[in-house]
UniProtKB/Swiss-Prot annotation:
Pathway where this protein functions: Amino-acid biosynthesis; L-lysine biosynthesis via AAA pathway; L-lysine from L-alpha-aminoadipate (Thermus route): step 2/5; Amino-acid biosynthesis; L-arginine biosynthesis
Bridged cysteine pairs (disulfide): none
EC number assigned by the record: 2.7.2.17, 2.7.2.19
Reaction catalyzed: [amino-group carrier protein]-C-terminal-N-(1,4-dicarboxybutan-1-yl)-L-glutamine + ATP = [amino-group carrier protein]-C-terminal-N-(1-carboxy-5-phosphooxy-5-oxopentan-1-yl)-L-glutamine + ADP; [amino-group carrier protein]-C-terminal-gamma-(L-glutamyl)-L-glutamate + ATP = [amino-group carrier protein]-C-terminal-gamma-(5-phospho-L-glutamyl)-L-glutamate + ADP
Cited CDD domains: AAK_NAGK-UC (cd04251)
UniProt binding sites for substrate: 35-36, 62, 167
Keywords: Amino-acid biosynthesis, Arginine biosynthesis, ATP-binding, Cytoplasm, Kinase, Lysine biosynthesis, Nucleotide-binding, Transferase
Chief location bin: cytoplasm
Record GO terms (molecular function): acetylglutamate kinase activity; ATP binding; N2-acetyl-L-aminoadipate kinase activity
Gene Ontology BP annotations: arginine biosynthetic process via ornithine; L-arginine biosynthetic process; lysine biosynthetic process via aminoadipic acid
Protein name stated in the entry: [LysW]-aminoadipate/[LysW]-glutamate kinase
EC main group: transferase
Native species: Saccharolobus islandicus (strain L.S.2.15 / Lassen #1)
Site (Transition state stabilizer): 5, 224
Amino acid sequence: MIVVKIGGRVVKNSLDKVILDIANINDKVILVHGGGDIVTDYTKRLGIEPVFVTSPEGIRSRYTTKEELEVYIMAMSLINKTITSKLCSLGKNAIGITGVDGGLLLAERKKRIIVIDERGKKRIIEGGYTGKVKEVRSEVINHLMKLFDIIVVSPLALDVEESTPLNIDGDQAAFAISKAVKVNVLVILSDVEGVLVEGKVVDRLTPEEAKELSKKIGPGMNRKLLMAAESVENGVNKVIIGSGVKDRPVSSALELNGTVIVNG
């Protein structure tokens, strides 16, 4: 079993390549998708101006109000069913779900977050409807995998305390699922060839090397490296960070094109 995570730009620009490639892979697949650019498009169409905040670490992320959460759910559902429809039309036994369904992903809403304001000052604001995954109900995945070959997962989670869906980071969802079911391989596909240092792809890293390198590279990729290291340390065989915009993107990553994080 493998987990594949595709970022929002891959969803927008290279989705058919990914779907066709996954349809030809002879393994069980959990496909976690993003879609931030598409969410932004729909938000603007509905006359809602999207808001982004920057953390003290320099990571820019969507600030999810109650109103925008509704748009997020609609857009992610559209992406999910588009992917699932295409896979089924290619003869694959696929199902599309969110992390809310079956209580697959249980999360805690961020009550307060620290952001950097326009003056460069730290400020504490209300957390909105964004959450952090606290638990993965792996039995949901295991049961569905007895019935289906491919599970397409939208990055939504259930806040049990407040009985509401939450927007969660797609990478976080993919890493959490991978650790919970201890998959063989986690493939992270974005619009870059892998982890770049001085313009060159780093071919291979141990978890320790990944943690060390995370201190020296930009926000976004540093989080991927930290989560990749933690995943390998917790039972995932290997994590591969590669390009989702090339031909055969998943197969290419499985052929170890990109950055491979693995023990030893």
